[in-house]
Amino acid sequence: MWNNVRQLNLAASALYALLLLVLAAAGCYWLIQRPAFALREIRIDGDTEHINAPTVRAGVVGRLKGNFFTVDLDLARVAFEQMPWVRHASVRRVWPNALAVTLEEYKPLGTWGNDQLVSVDGELFTANQGELDAELPSFDGPEGSAKEVVARYRDFAKWFAPIHATPEEVTLSPRYAWTVKLSNGMQVELGRERNSDTLPDRIQRLVAAWPSVTQRWGGDIEYADLRYPNGFAIRAAGMRFLTDTDKGKK
């Protein structure tokens, strides 16, 4: 090889190219570590009705590792999405030392259980309920049932509309039986949903009879049990049931 000029030239060229690569890599590493590229600004925009940008920024900045070039954008996105009210975050670099973050927040539909909220998309999330702008419906159900409960809430709102009542509480029991508390104060036991017609048929029976029910007992119906196959039972304020002793006095 040492007597072969062509091979020596090739080897020298290869070593020279390798040296240039090493120097270029070292130069790049030196450059990207300069203080000028340390992250100095996090710009937050997007849907932030319930999101306080300074609070989010303060909660995330200590979890960001690296500078403009080395920060992991996926890890940064996850950090933002772990903040209260944040449903989705997109993060991008802004030359030379900033991140631009666009946030999408959860749209609350109501409360879920004791300490969670549920979104209009049926997603559970945790946030300060004191930040809610209005009294929202209450929901509860078995694990994994949030989307089903939210869908049924919308159905109940439509089915009970003819009696001018809206759902304020919707509960799905561990046995998958439905209970609804309406805005007129009435609690409705609907039972289990055996097929797609079970719930609308039961509610329709009550709706059809509602004029007669309110004419007889007034509008203050406290409870309705719709689980019967061909009818329903109600309890109205002031309704009194006779005991055997009462019957004997008549």
Swiss-Prot record:
GO terms for cellular component: cell division site; plasma membrane. Residues 1-11 are cytoplasmic. One of its GO terms (biological process) is cell septum assembly. Residues 33-250 are periplasmic. Gene3D superfamilies: Cell division protein FtsQ/DivIB (3.40.50.11690), membrane protein fhac (3.10.20.310). Its main location: membrane. It is a single-pass type II membrane protein. The keyword Cell division applies. It is found in: Cell inner membrane. The keyword Signal does not apply. Keywords: Cell cycle, Cell division, Cell inner membrane, Cell membrane, Membrane, Transmembrane, Transmembrane helix. Residues 37-106 form the POTRA domain. The chain crosses the membrane at residues 12-32. InterPro entries: Cell_div_FtsQ/DivIB_C, FtsQ, FtsQ_C_sf, POTRA, POTRA_FtsQ_type. Belongs to the FtsQ/DivIB family. FtsQ subfamily. Essential cell division protein. May link together the upstream cell division proteins, which are predominantly cytoplasmic, with the downstream cell division proteins, which are predominantly periplasmic. May control correct divisome assembly. Part of a complex composed of FtsB, FtsL and FtsQ. This is Cell division protein FtsQ. It comes from Burkholderia pseudomallei (strain K96243). The gene is ftsQ.
